[in-house]
Each structure stands twice: as structure tokens, then as C-alpha cells.
Amino acid sequence: MATIKSTDDTFETLLKEHKILLNDFWAPWCGPCTQIAPTLEEISEEMKEITIAKHNIDDEPNLPTKYGVRGIPTMLLFKDGELKATKVGATSKTDLVSWLKENI
């Protein structure tokens, strides 16, 4: 499954529809965000139990504020609608997969 788009308006629906949701807060001008984007695409294909959503903070600023996002990329991992873990900054695929497995 490819990554999907998250918006301020669709986020609550995404939480309800997907058992495990990784919401990536990013912006097009953010170097580390664009660096980690291909890794997130790969993980979305390999770990099909996780839905990965991308939330552009420039276009949709309310949700990042609600969750206290101060730097990007920030990834919030939700399971059954509850926030389970937060990861800030770009990281290697190995580290990201390990973090996901530890928290799901």
C-alpha cells in the first residue's frame, strides 16, 4: 500500500478506519522530510499492517498544533486510535522499522 494523504479534516476518519496508523508530519521545503519519504514508501509496501499517512504542515497547520509538533519530520504512531509513540527527525530504515515493531 502506498502512503496516503492526511489532512486536518480527514485525520479522525483515518484513525477510525486504520488499526495502525503512522502519521508523518512534513513539508516540501524540509530536507530531512524529503530524505525519509522514499523509506516511508518502502515500509508502506513491506509492512502492510501499518497505514502510513503524510500530513503537510504548511497546507494543514491545525493538527500539528494539536499534537504539539515543533519540528519535522515528526512521526506519530497510533494503534486503535491511541497515540503509542512519537519519533522526531529522519532516521535509517533499519531504525525506523525497529521502532515500529517495538511499538505495535
Where are these regions (language model features)?
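Structural micro-motif
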Residues: 61, 67-76
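Conserved redox-active cysteine motifs that mediate thiol-disulfide chemistry
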Residues: 25-39
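Hydrophobic beta-strand anchors of alpha/beta hydrolase catalytic cores
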Residues: 22-23, 52, 75
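A short beta-strand-turn-helix
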Residues: 3-20, 61
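Short pre-active-site segment immediately N-terminal to redox-active cysteine/selenocysteine motifs
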Residues: 19, 25-29, 71
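Non-catalytic, surface beta->alpha helical segment in thiol-disulfide oxidoreductase systems
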Residues: 79-104
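Residue-level signature of catalytic and energy-coupling elements of molecular machines
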Residues: 11, 23, 40, 56, ...
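Thiol-based oxidoreductase modules, predominantly thioredoxin-like and allied folds used
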Residues: 6, 37-62
